[in-house]
């Protein structure tokens, strides 16, 4: 029984670009969607994750809200009373004006996207789950001295290349690295997502990078939010807006020599101290947790449906 004055829970489908089944478990988008769905449910909503195969299914007609996490695949909203929301979390260059116009609302994981005004996009940055990614996820400095988690994306990713050129020995988890590195440098092709919080929290340093176009448009990587929430030391390539969110706690480098200086010294000297990192972790958990994103999405969806 609903309490008087309380709004009816909305039925949500959160659509990802990932395939269904076990294959989808290896996609970060799947875990992102699961954490968001949990946050929506915790705020009284009905929600489920939908893989790319069900994105345009007739089953979406039974939803109140469909939220599409836009990655590599375009999803065309179905006509009808369902409210369709688009959240551009990666590859913003693929989103065209006609696609954006087909949605009731568009969100972008950047506060600095040059096309936000053109497309009517509302800034909504990436997020983390502080129940999983927390300072208690692992003992500091008990894991990999230098850690990188990510596939090659078909290239020798610059931050890994630069780190190795400095003489550093990063521990690599990801697909495709055998084309660039000797096999002994590769820990595994896949690090299970439920092991990721401990890996970040226990690492000496976590390496982060962005696609160049995403860095230029301020689409900050999800890895930054997850790793920062654990209190990890992080070094990243520069990205527009990174300092606005993470301050000077996340170190950035513009030239290989700068990275060599950061990785070659004592981490205690090269990075802010643990108190500063935990201060950032607390702020990220509060301001950039999935609970905050769910509240914003619910408020926006309800407003659209009232209008």
Model-derived regions: residue spans:
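Conserved donor-nucleotide binding/catalytic region of nucleotide-linked donor-dependent transferases
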Residues: 264-282
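Catalytic core of nucleotide-activated saccharide and alditol-phosphate transferases
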Residues: 72-169, 177, 288-292, 305
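Acidic, amphipathic alpha-helical patches
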Residues: 96, 193-196, 224, 259
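Conserved catalytic-core segment of nucleotide-activated headgroup transferases in glycan assembly
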Residues: 23-31, 38, 130-202, 213-214
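N-terminal pre-catalytic "stem/leader" segment of glycosyltransferase-like enzymes
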Residues: 1-83, 114-115, 237, 242, ...
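Nucleotide-sugar-dependent
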Residues: 193-194, 206-225, 229, 236-239, ...
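Structural alpha-helical scaffold elements that stabilize or flank donor/cofactor-binding regions
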Residues: 58-60, 98-99, 198-199
């Amino acid at each position: 029984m609903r309490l008087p004055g309380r709004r009816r829970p909305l039925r949500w489908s959160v659509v990802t670009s990932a395939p269904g089944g076990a294959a989808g478990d290896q996609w970060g988008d799947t875990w992102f969607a699961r954490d968001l769905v949990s946050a929506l449910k915790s705020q009284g909503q009905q929600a489920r994750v939908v893989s790319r195969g069900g994105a345009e299914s007739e089953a979406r007609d039974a939803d109140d809200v469909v939220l599409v996490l836009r990655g590599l695949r375009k999803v065309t909203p179905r006509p009808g009373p369902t409210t369709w929301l688009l959240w551009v979390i990666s590859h913003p260059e693929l989103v065209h004006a006609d696609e954006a116009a087909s949605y009731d609302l568009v969100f972008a994981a950047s506060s600095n996207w040059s096309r936000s005004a053109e497309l009517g996009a509302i800034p909504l940055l990436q997020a983390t789950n502080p129940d999983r990614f927390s300072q208690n996820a692992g003992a500091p400095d008990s894991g990999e001295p230098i850690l990188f988690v990510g596939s090659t994306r078909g290239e020798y990713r610059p931050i890994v290349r630069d780190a190795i050129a400095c003489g550093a020995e990063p521990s690599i988890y990801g697909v495709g690295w055998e084309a660039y590195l000797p096999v002994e440098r590769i820990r595994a092709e896949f690090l299970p997502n439920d092991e990721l919080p401990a890996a970040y929290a226990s690492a000496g340093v976590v390496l982060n990078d962005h696609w160049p176009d995403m860095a230029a448009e301020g689409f900050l990587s999800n890895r930054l939010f997850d790793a920062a929430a654990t209190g990890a030391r992080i070094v990243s390539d520069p990205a527009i807006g990174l300092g606005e969110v993470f301050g000077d706690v996340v170190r950035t480098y513009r030239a290989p020599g700068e990275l060599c200086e950061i990785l070659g010294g004592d981490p205690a000297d090269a990075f802010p101290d643990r108190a500063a990192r935990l201060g950032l972790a607390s702020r990220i958990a509060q301001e950039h947790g999935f609970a905050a994103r769910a509240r914003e999405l619910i408020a926006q969806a309800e407003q659209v449906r009232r209008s």
